[in-house]
UniProtKB/Swiss-Prot annotation:
Alphabetical list of PROSITE patterns matching this protein: NR_LBD, NUCLEAR_REC_DBD_1, NUCLEAR_REC_DBD_2
Residues reported to bind progesterone: R756
PTM per Swiss-Prot/TrEMBL: Phosphorylated on multiple serine sites. Several of these sites are hormone-dependent. Phosphorylation on Ser-293 is highly hormone-dependent and modulates ubiquitination and sumoylation on Lys-387. Phosphorylation on Ser-344 also requires induction by hormone. Basal phosphorylation on Ser-82, Ser-190 and Ser-399 is increased in response to progesterone and can be phosphorylated in vitro by the CDK2-A1 complex. Increased levels of phosphorylation on Ser-399 also in the presence of EGF, heregulin, IGF, PMA and FBS. Sumoylation is hormone-dependent and represses transcriptional activity. Sumoylation on all three sites is enhanced by PIAS3. Desumoylated by SENP1. Sumoylation on Lys-387, the main site of sumoylation, is repressed by ubiquitination on the same site, and modulated by phosphorylation at Ser-293.
Recorded name of the encoding gene: Pgr
Region (Mediates transcriptional transrepression (in isoform A)): 165-304
Protein name: Progesterone receptor
Compartment(s): Nucleus; Cytoplasm
Spans through the membrane: none
Short motif LXXL motif 2, span: 115-119
Residue spans binding DNA: 557-629
Organism placement in taxonomy: Eukaryota, Metazoa, Chordata, Craniata, Vertebrata
Intervals of motif LXXL motif 1: 56-60
Length: 923
């Protein structure tokens, strides 16, 4: 740090020579210490060595302590010598004391206080406070250990550590056997110092009584311009600091010997016998003197960390790093500012520049990785570019990422946990957001819902994502840019995404979508072109009804997509389609399609094919006599739901033939069209489920109950699959979906049993499955005959009411939605909208047969009464099922796994009245 230039290299300088007038100007050379070579001769006063003072002078030291004086010369000579003081510091201090004994003392005391503050370790050891600067007697020695005359007080080995971290000992008493000019070896140096190997080139002392030669030592000092021989015994350091270099390269474990090649932690003069002498063993078990830094005896003795040179630029840079800690979040420098980086410890490092912002913070680590990119700062080399298209998010997590600092090279930290990659810009091409959208698994609600939730999303890999990580719904900019294949409709996600009107279906005779086909496909749109304008953002999903149009921001004609003028003939249409439908129905026109009955009907091409336009009007639910019933509120509510119509791109089996036959009719004929949502319910009806019962063996109660439980398990899986395809059900929260299935699975099974018994055997027997049909005779032989009679009431009611298939489908959905928890559901508003929609669908299904308001109202009352009566009937089944489950071992009845979970978790709640049944009529 301090560059010394010899003005007269030919003048010899002995150990006792007086210091030059200009030599006291450098505050970093040493403190004022007693001279270990007091018996030596003094050289001429003409030998002058002028130092170049560094910039820390006048910055670190003030003049507040000039009045302090040492007690006496004897006390100074009796002061203990630190094992980390340099030899040159003692010589120079003795020369400086002869001229001005107070000024160097002032500098050394303040330097002692400043360095004690900077380099003191953090932790509980800091409770030992260092003496103030004005009271300190010894200072730091920056250049090397100070050698005493008596070889018995010299350590056995010369320490290889930088002496900056060692603190001098406190005053010691007079030592016997040593002169006034000799130093007493400190007692607080820890014993592990004795285990250090001697450096190369060291020569053992011949004996205790032998003293080192007092001849002037000639020291060769390496300067920038070459080698220069100086007569002074004080060592001259290279102008380029080396301590940080050793820190960056090796962490300070090994250092070069004095005679070795340069590049070590500390440079010492060459061919100096004082630095090649070994040291004898030190005294042990001595207490640490007050004010001594614990690093001198604890950290430095075991952890050989090289010490940074006291350079003002380096201190300024380190202080800037600590103050501006936000720019070092990714590396280890933010946590330990003086610790070496975690690069390759043996890699050589370049010389350290001494600017205000050094580039030596991290050593170079070879070529940067391809997946690395600068997290902070504006500097980004051409080789470190983010590959937005080719590189995936997993590539960066597999390899360590180089972090670039401003003005520094890349340093890799492979053993640090990598922070997440910063979010990229939104993709510019459509479909990228769906591909890049992350998926998060949803934890099960309770232990009872684990198996059911696993079945709900068995082959999908994970339940649908929710919250802020939900897949982005398709929101195309225009209606013509969103098309769907005719064989499937993607299911709506959970409540976090925009609801889809139609879920995955299996149409046109194709097999229904299984678990794999029901996976949400983000890259596909979710509705048909005529309904794109009805898509609402997530914030509006809970405010407006799903199947109504009263609160929609814009009213669109369901036939051609033009702006609707009102509800005409029961459907929200424009004036053009209203007039067209009126003329087509009142006039005697037989429209035929020139194509395949699949022409596009929109605002521009609505006049091209009147046959397809009329077909679409009829399919949407337009009825010529609908305007006659506007005075009746019920009919008006019923017709308002006709807005939700199946678009033209969906075709059912034999659709073209049936519609072609219905379109070529006379005005006197009556049109019977099934509402589109009911058609969807027909298409998602589960297949036939078999019980696997062996009818060749005699019936026993245990065998029949076991077969019924196995059938119930399969039907429960079928209910889960059916509910996933149910329009509007997937818009509910996943917890609500599981809760509704657990509360209603028994009602759905017994209701399906009544429908099969009504359709296949006219209600004369209980049609559990094609391989398990119980007649009255077989029922009487069973122990649960009374339970069979309870279940037999449902098909008998079907026979009495002559329930149609459309009515059954709507009532089945309402059974799924007829029981909720007392505290309500998470998506209660969506649930109420869905339930109201299917109630209106039931009204429309009733209107297919019952003509007139009064018959329709009576029919609605009868069917809803039947739904209310199922609550009490199913309660008996729940009680019997729970009792059988509790006594299953004694009764030798087997219960499948998922069914057991549902029974154990939910049936006690239901029987205890912890659920809320939704009734249509008050009791």
């Amino acid at each position: 740090m301090t560059e010394l230039q010899a003005k007269d290299p030919r003048t010899l300088h002995t150990s006792g020579a007086a210091p030059s007038p200009t030599h006291v100007g450098s505050p970093l050379l040493a403190r004022l210490d007693p001279d270990p070579f007091q018996g030596s001769q003094h050289s001429d006063a003409s030998s002058v060595v002028s130092p170049i003072p560094i910039s820390l002078d006048r910055l670190l030291f003030s003049r507040s302590c000039q009045a302090q004086e040492l007690p006496d010369e004897k006390t100074q000579n009796q002061q203990s010598l630190s094992d980390v003081e340099g030899a040159f510091s003692g010589v120079e201090a003795s020369r400086r004391r002869s001229r001005n004994p107070r000024a160097p003392e002032k500098d050394s005391r303040l330097l002692d206080s400043v360095l004690d503050t900077l380099l003191a370790p953090s932790g509980p050891e800091q409770s030992q406070t260092s003496p103030p600067a004005c009271e300190a007697i010894t200072s730091w020695c920056l250049f090397g250990p100070e050698l005493p005359e008596d070889p018995r007080s010299v350590p056995a080995t010369k320490g290889l550590l930088s002496p900056l971290m060692s603190r001098p000992e406190s005053k010691a008493g007079d030592s016997s056997g040593t002169g006034a000019g000799q130093k007493v070896l400190p007692k607080a140096v820890s014993p592990p110092r004795q285990l250090l190997l001697p450096t190369s080139g060291s020569a053992h002392w011949p004996g205790a009584g032998v003293k080192p030669s007092q001849q002037p030592a000639t020291v060769e000092v390496e300067e920038d311009g070459g080698l220069e021989t100086e007569g002074s015994a004080g060592p001259l350091l290279k102008s380029k600091p080396r301590a940080l270099e050793g820190m960056c390269s090796g962490g300070g474990v090994t250092a070069n010997a004095p005679g070795a090649a340069p590049g070590g932690v500390t440079l010492v003069p060459k061919e100096d016998s004082r630095f090649s002498a070994p040291r004898v063993s030190l005294e042990q078990d001595a207490p640490v003197a007050p004010g001594r830094s614990p690093l001198a005896t604890t950290v430095v003795d075991f952890i050989h960390v090289p010490i940074l040179p006291l350079n003002h630029a380096l201190l300024a840079a380190r202080t800037r790093q600590l103050l501006e800690g936000d720019s070092y979040d990714g590396g280890a420098a933010a946590q330990v500012p003086f610790a070496p980086p975690r690069g390759s410890p043996s890699a050589p490092s370049p010389p350290v520049p001494c600017g205000d912002f050094p580039d030596c913070t991290y050593p170079p680590e070879g070529d940067p990785k391809e997946d690395g990119f600068p997290v902070y700062g504006e500097f980004q080399p051409p080789g470190l570019k983010i590959k937005e298209e080719e590189e995936g998010t997993e590539a960066a997590s597999r390899s360590p990422r180089p972090y670039l600092l401003a003005g520094a090279s890349a340093a890799t930290f492979p053993d640090f946990p990598l922070p997440p990659r910063p979010p990229r810009a939104p993709p510019s091409r459509p479909g990228e957001a769906a591909v890049a959208a992350p998926s998060a698994a949803v934890s099960p609600v309770s232990s009872s819902g684990s198996a059911l939730e696993c079945i709900l999303y068995k082959a999908e890999g994970a339940p649908p994502t929710q919250g802020s990580f939900a897949p982005l719904p398709c929101k195309p900019p225009a209606a013509s840019s969103c098309l769907l294949p005719r064989d499937s409709l993607p299911a709506a996600p959970t409540s976090s995404a925009a609801p889809a009107i139609y879920p995955p279906l299996g149409l046109n005779g194709l097999p229904q979508l299984g678990y794999q086909a029901a996976v949400l496909k983000d890259s596909l749109p979710q509705v048909y072109p005529p309904y794109l304008n009805y898509l609402r953002p997530d914030s509006e999903a809970s405010q407006s009804p799903q199947y109504g149009f009263d609160s929609l921001p814009q009213k669109i004609c369901l036939i051609c997509g033009d702006e609707a003028s009102g509800c005409h003939y029961g459907v929200l249409t424009c004036g053009s389609c209203k007039v067209f439908f009126k003329r087509a129905m009142e006039g005697q026109h037989n429209y035929l399609c020139a194509g395949r009955n699949d022409c596009i009907v929109d605002k521009i091409r609505r006049k091209n094919c009147p046959a397809c336009r009329l077909r679409k009007c009829c399919q949407a639910g337009m009825v010529l006599g609908g305007r006659k019933f506007k005075k009746f509120n019920k009919v008006r509510v019923m017709r308002a739901l006709d807005g939700v119509a199946l678009p033209q791109s969906v075709a059912f089996p034999n659709e073209s033939q049936t519609l072609g036959q219905r379109i070529t009719f006379s005005p006197n004929q009556e049109i019977q069209l099934v509402p589109p949502l009911i058609n969807l319910l027909m298409s998602i009806e589960p297949d036939v489920v078999y019980a696997g019962h062996d009818n060749t063996k005699p019936d026993t109660s245990s065998s029949l109950l076991t077969s019924l439980n196995q059938l119930g398990e399969r039907q429960l899986l079928s209910v889960v699959k059916w509910s996933k395809s149910l329009p509007g059900f997937r818009n509910l929260h996943i917890d609500d979906q599981i809760t509704l299935i657990q509360y209603s699975w028994m009602s759905l099974m017994v209701f399906g049993l009544g429908w099969r018994s009504y359709k296949h055997v006219s209600g004369q027997m209980l049609y559990f499955a094609p391989d398990l049909i119980l007649n009255e005779q077989r029922m009487k032989e069973l122990s649960f005959y009374s339970l069979c009679l309870t279940m037999w009431q449902i098909p008998q009611e079907f026979v009495k009411l002559q329930v149609t298939h459309e009515e059954f489908l709507c009532m089945k959905v309402l059974l799924l939605l007829n029981t909720i928890p007392l505290e309500g559901l998470r998506s209660q508003s969506q649930f109420e909208e869905m339930r109201s929609s299917y109630i209106r669908e039931l009204i429309k299904a009733i209107g297919l047969r019952q003509k007139g308001v009064v018959p329709s109202s009576q029919r609605f009352y009868q069917l809803t009464k039947l739904l209310d009566s199922l609550h009490d009937l199913v309660k008996q089944l729940h009680l019997y099922c729970l009792n059988t489950f509790i006594q299953s071992r004694a009764l030798a009845v087997e219960f499948p796994e998922m069914m057991s979970e549902v029974i154990a978790a939910q049936l006690p709640k239901i029987l205890a009245g912890m659920v809320k049944p939704l009734l249509f009529h008050k009791k």
